Amino acid sequence: GYTKMLLGVVGYFIEHKSRNSLLFQPTDSAAEDFMKSHVEATIRNVPCLKDLSPWLGRKHRDNTLTLKRFSSGVGFWCLGGAAAKNYREKSVDVVCYDELSSFEPDVEKEGSPTLLGDKRIEGSVWPKSIRGSTPKIKGTCQIEKAANESAHFMRFYVPCPHCGEAQYLKFGDESTP
């Protein structure tokens, strides 16, 4: 769910806002797989992105496993988050983290992935840092840490199936009704 929403958000920033974007996956191989299976399919299946991709389906310097450069000049990078070198030399407006809980907490003793990645948006007029993941072990989970450090706390409210009153989703254990 989150990954598909993230692709929609990145597509919006590429087509409507002309913003350079950088998406981090936990590893280089995960980033390559993501580019092949998700990004290329999205570009192929979304008409406005396909129109910005004259290189689609062929070898071209603007069509690599780490970068998609669109005819509008906008760039989209997808890199692994395990190597410190991947957090350098990119100036973007949007940085995204997919499966943040699977990242190492310290990247080659240079800092956390979000600390290093968010440096890429420091010069942007409209900086965006987007983070998401399936939560893992409480107390050591990076998405939990990111949520706790966030200036914003949002909940998704749904109507109670019995009385209709709005309530937020709270997950419990087997004994929770």
Predicted regions and their residues:
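Phosphate/NTP-binding elements of NTP-utilizing enzymes
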Residues: 1-177
